[in-house]
Amino acid sequence: MYYQKDESETSNIIKSPIFRDKETFLYKNRYAVFIFSSIAALGLFAYSTNYLNETPTMNSELYESYLKIPMKYGELDEYSTIDLFKQYKTNFSRSYETDDEESLRYTNFKNFLTIIDKRNEDEFIYGSGKSLHGITKFADLTEDEFKKGFLGYRPTYDTNAIVKEVDTELVNRTVVNWANIYTTAVKDQGYCGSCWAFSATEQIESDSIRMGLLTVDDALSPEQIVQCDNIDYGCEGGNTDTAFEYVMNAGGIERDSDYPYTSYYDVTGECTSDTTKYMVTVNEYYSLKDEDDMIAYTLSTGPLSVCVAASTWSSYVSGIITSCDTDVDHCVQAVGVNTDEGYWIVRNSWGTDWGLEGYIWLETGVDMCMISYDPKYTITTLV
């Protein structure tokens, strides 16, 4: 059904804290680059002004160019890097049991700083330089630890999804953000490769809210899918198609409050679902053929479950990603799109202490991070 524009709803959309305009983003990047600091909620923390004294003074001719490139962590000496690591541990409540582990995590941290520099360079070389990478809560992990614990997409070669086309000519808006309108709050999968279950659960939530079956306070249970979907692999990964199939075959899904998430630390327990507590079920699920149809659907109707290439997101801080990998390894939810400024609004499941309060922006029109690889939505009914 085509969505008719409602002025009061549009007002709520524009007021959403994650719907920031281009000028705000550029100002925050300018702040981050020039004084080497940013906001803790966006993944960076304030640096001691002593670090600025160790960098060359910028003259007026170089001022504009410095505003366009992030400061390089590789330029810090060892003393400053150690001090930075101490600050990281404080801000992200990190403590280590042994000196050996502390040494290992410090080595990982230094490697992460190198990765940040490389990704910021790639944004300028291969992209449009519209995003900023920096220190996040993942900074003391190895790349393998990050991929194992926070990604988790596994491909499926057999799907019952029905391909739908969208009439793009019916769309009469260019900007929409369904966050907090057709979505529940941002969730945190913890150190468990359960992104696929979160993406599927969030899509079932959104479609049910859109159809008037649930409210934004009715969070459903990703843990039920993690524990009870025998086709997928719990914290070792899975697929949204088979997650939707599980809910269809099981006959429904419970509320998160009835079947809470317990797999934060890579432990998948036994299935304990209770059919008497099922809220909604999936009748059918659909896929879209390309990014144009995705944009039209999102603008006119609602969010989409998507699976993407997210290995470089570990260091994302703010802005529009314009350079990305192409290996699909993570499932999330596209909750809005701004075709005027050219970006998707994507809800992740890594908590609100990552990215833009749990969200990330991806460039539109170029299949950034393979966003059009596996878009899905569902038709749900009450149990």
Predicted feature descriptions by range:
Residues 1-27:
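Short, low-complexity, Lys/Arg-enriched N-terminal segments of secretory-pathway carbohydrate enzymes
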Residues 29-34, 45-383:
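Catalytic-core signature of thiol
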Residues 39-44:
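Sec-dependent, cleavable N-terminal signal peptides
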